Amino acid sequence: MSQLPIRYEFIKSCKQTGARLGRVHTPHGSFDTPVFMPVGTLATVKTMAPEELKAMEAGIILSNTYHLWLRPGHDIVKEAGGLHKFMNWDRAILTDSGGFQVFSLSEFRKIEEEGVHFRNHLNGDKLFLSPEKAMDIQNALGSDIMMAFDECPPYPAEYDYMKRSVERTSRWAERCLTAHQRPEDQGLFGIIQGGEYEELRKQSAKDLVSLDFPGYAIGGLSVGEPKDVMNRVLEFTTPLLPADKPRYLMGVGSPDSLIDGAIRGVDMFDCVLPTRIARNGTLMTSEGRLVVKNAKYERDFRPIDENCDCYTCKNYTRAYIRHLIKTNETFGIRLTTYHNLHFLLKLMEQVREAIREDRLGDFKEEFFERYGFNEPNAKNF
């Protein structure tokens, strides 16, 4: 199972930082790592056409099991021939298990050994999601990489609560493996939990590595903890994971965290950040963040980023994009979304290049300096 259908090829590590350069092979093509995965919650990366994502060299995107289960329904996606055909995307797709949405969107929830009872966030209907159901939905969706159903504890959480949660996540992971119907063409990743407790991360990693998943995710981070806590947890967690399998840090997408994660041995990242902030007119640039709605850009006829070669920056000005965002024009959101995704995918290309040339530490220093991330009260996105 560890060879198919998901295989990790190690290329080299950075002599300066230990970051890994690699390639993940899937039934729908390969992609180089470290990689950022754009999020297509409802089988679409909001406002983007698949051809545009390919043009910016996205090799894999993420879709949400919970949202697709509710709308249009996994049965409809299956009938369409699976998610790839349904959304006309022939590269790799990763689906999450639905766990995070159940724990973050639903007001009412009751966790039992069998699974989680909760209310549909759209209409209040009672729903139940279990490891078996999460596998059933993802098998129907036909993603290349599926995620095990885990419990997503809040931050901060007491040690005893977290210990029980980790034990349950391990039992659920085993049930996911048993319920997985398509191991020959869909790879199932396990999720390491344990909050900020090193002992519990060790236990979680030991349990899940013994089950021999083809890849592992580090869950329970980017949930409100300070950055130094996240970095510390990564430092003691990634070494616990097999070097010949991909490592995925869930829900992380700010430029500084992508670089910090890569330095700590992470291969895959996803986050709604670039697309979500784009809709508010916040842009990532080589000089830091730019809020295009600000009055000072009203007569600014320069591109968003003069160092960027994306479609948006080659063709449109800050003044024009500001006007579109201020008047709620959809085209404005398309332009800002395109730019932010292009920026992050390009950043990861630069990270891979820096690893190849053994200079990721230098790259981080220069980037953080330019962005102001080194300052004590550095503002994030």
From Swiss-Prot:
Role this protein plays: Catalyzes the base-exchange of a guanine (G) residue with the queuine precursor 7-aminomethyl-7-deazaguanine (PreQ1) at position 34 (anticodon wobble position) in tRNAs with GU(N) anticodons (tRNA-Asp, -Asn, -His and -Tyr). Catalysis occurs through a double-displacement mechanism. The nucleophile active site attacks the C1' of nucleotide 34 to detach the guanine base from the RNA, forming a covalent enzyme-RNA intermediate. The proton acceptor active site deprotonates the incoming PreQ1, allowing a nucleophilic attack on the C1' of the ribose to form the product.
Pathway, per record: tRNA modification; tRNA-queuosine biosynthesis
Keyword tRNA-binding on entry: no
Amino-acid positions noted as binding Zn(2+) in the UniProt annotation, renumbered to this chain: 308, 310, 313, 339
Keywords annotated in UniProt: Glycosyltransferase, Metal-binding, Queuosine biosynthesis, Transferase, tRNA processing, Zinc
Name recorded for this polypeptide: Queuine tRNA-ribosyltransferase
Transferase listed as a keyword: yes
Subunit structure: Homodimer. Within each dimer, one monomer is responsible for RNA recognition and catalysis, while the other monomer binds to the replacement base PreQ1.
Active site, renumbered: 96 (proton acceptor), 270 (nucleophile)
Catalysed reactions, semicolon-separated: 7-aminomethyl-7-carbaguanine + guanosine(34) in tRNA = 7-aminomethyl-7-carbaguanosine(34) in tRNA + guanine
GO CC term (a single one): cytosol
Pfam families registered for this protein in UniProt: TGT (PF01702)
Any single biological process term in GO: queuosine biosynthetic process
A Gene Ontology molecular function term of the record: metal ion binding
Binding-site residues for substrate, renumbered to this chain: 96-100, 150, 193, 220
Its EC number(s): 2.4.2.29
Top-rank taxon, per record: Bacteria
Region (RNA binding): 251-257, 275-279
PANTHER family (alphabetical): QUEUINE TRNA-RIBOSYLTRANSFERASE
Gene3D superfamilies linked: Queuine tRNA-ribosyltransferase-like
Cofactor binding remark: Binds 1 zinc ion per subunit.
EC top class named in words: transferase
Family, similarity comment: Belongs to the queuine tRNA-ribosyltransferase family.
Cofactor needs: Zn(2+)
